[in-house]
A protein has these predicted regions:
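Asp-based phosphoryl-transfer active-site loop
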Residues: 70-85, 275
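Short catalytic/ligand-binding loop motif for oxyanion handling, primarily in non-cytosolic enzymes
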Residues: 82, 90, 200-201
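Generic macromolecular interface patches on structured domains
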Residues: 26, 59-63, 88, 103, ...
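Non-catalytic pre-domain segments flanking phosphatase-related domains
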Residues: 2-23, 27-76, 98, 102-104, ...
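Short, solvent-exposed loop/turn elements at domain surfaces
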Residues: 58-60, 81-83, 225-226
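A metal-dependent, Asp-based hydrolase signature
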Residues: 86, 91-170, 174
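N-terminal low-complexity, Ser/Thr- and acidic-residue-enriched intrinsically disordered segments
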Residues: 27, 76, 84-87, 93
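C-terminal cap/substrate-recognition subdomain and adjoining C-terminal extension
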Residues: 3, 31-40, 44-50, 54, ...
């Protein structure tokens, strides 16, 4: 059958188009997938995360985890952002003391508030945990939940870290944010399980980490319900309701999530029980601890692995030994992270 030149040209165009599509498809298959963890150096820590995700999300894997059970928990201070030289919430509460005393002048003559107002650093250095709890409690007592979150946001927008001279919300660890995003992209719900104040972290968790308020579990003050000027209101009271630290973390997880996580990330003695609870379950489990061993890019403290001791974010040698014995991965900031912060 004779074909006209026009028909032949049309066939040639279709063939060329088909060939182009085929070549593009082949190139796409050959191109490597984007690295989901670009801020991590190649090594055991990065491999542990990738292999865990692969085996728990592959339906053909004997360690497959149904989507409804995919839960990963992250401590915040020292795990997701800088906790030295003092916890961010303590810095916030100290900054709030002047406003608190202005509203309640009698506190100016009471410790521990007097030491803060007068700038008595020697007295502040002797603050006990109870003193700090008083200051933290006073920083939010009497404020509605909504009002307190706005106060936190305003502080976070202006307060700067003494070493880095950047807002605390910029001092989040890029590798850990990538790990959270990677887990979420594979069907995991990521929760922040912090010893810090629940409402404090909820004020910025979504914007900074992509974690909504309902997926933040933290220490809580008592909250009172009342109707103010016809408006139902939840107000913080100056009394502790629950401390979400150490053995409290598994309790908080059970209370809010209602199931054992598949993965848990921490950095200190306060996270020990959360990792024990998480990795004590059946099937594939992942436990990881961040070791701060990079004084040049961040801080170095332990005292695990011979690092300097610290009362903030203590990582004891006994926890390090337990991690090695139970197969938890210890993340070395110095060796495992290509960069620490997004601005590096």
């Amino acid at each position: 059958m004779n074909r006209s030149p026009t028909a032949i040209l049309q066939i040639s165009r279709r063939a060329a188009l088909a060939l182009t599509v085929a070549l593009l498809g082949a190139c796409a298959q050959m191109a490597p997938a984007p690295d989901p963890l670009p801020s991590w150096n190649e090594g055991p820590a990065k491999d542990a995360i990738v292999q865990f995700v692969r085996k728990t999300t592959d339906s053909a894997s004997p360690q497959f985890v149904p989507p409804a059970q995919r839960v990963a928990t992250f401590d915040q201070d020292g795990t997701l952002w800088v906790e030295q030289p003092m916890y961010a919430q303590v810095a916030f509460a100290l900054d709030r003391v002047k406003d608190v005393v202005k509203a309640q002048p009698a506190l100016a003559n009471e410790e521990p508030f007097k030491a803060v107002v007068t700038g008595d650093r020697a007295a502040m250095a002797r603050f006990t945990e109870g003193d700090l709890l008083k200051i933290v409690g006073a920083s939010q007592a009497g404020l509605s939940i909504e009002a307190f979150r706005e106060v936190v946001k305003a502080w976070a927008a202006t307060a700067k870290h003494p070493k880095f001279q950047r807002p605390y919300t910029e001092l989040v660890y890029a590798p850990m944010v990538e790990a959270m995003k990677y887990l979420r992209a594979n069907g995991y719900r990521t929760y922040i399980v912090t010893g810090g104040g629940q409402e404090f972290v909820r004020a910025f968790a979504d914007a900074v980490y992509g974690v909504p308020p309902e997926q933040v579990i933290g220490s809580m003050l008592k909250v009172d319900y009342s109707v103010r000027n016809g408006v139902p209101t939840m107000t913080n009271a100056p009394a502790v309701f629950f401390i979400n630290d150490k053995a409290g973390k598994p309790v908080g997880i059970n209370m809010v999530i209602g199931q054992r996580p598949q993965a848990a990330f921490g950095n200190s003695d306060g996270d020990q029980q959360m990792l024990e609870w998480t990795t004590g379950g059946a099937g594939a489990r992942l436990g990881m601890l961040v070791l701060h061993d990079d004084a040049q890019r961040e801080y170095a403290y332990g005292p695990a692995a011979g690092l300097p001791a610290s009362h903030v974010g203590t990582f004891a040698q006994s926890l390090y030994d337990e991690a090695k014995a139970k197969g938890w991965t210890v993340i070395s900031i110095k060796n495992d992270w290509k960069r620490v912060f997004a601005f590096d």
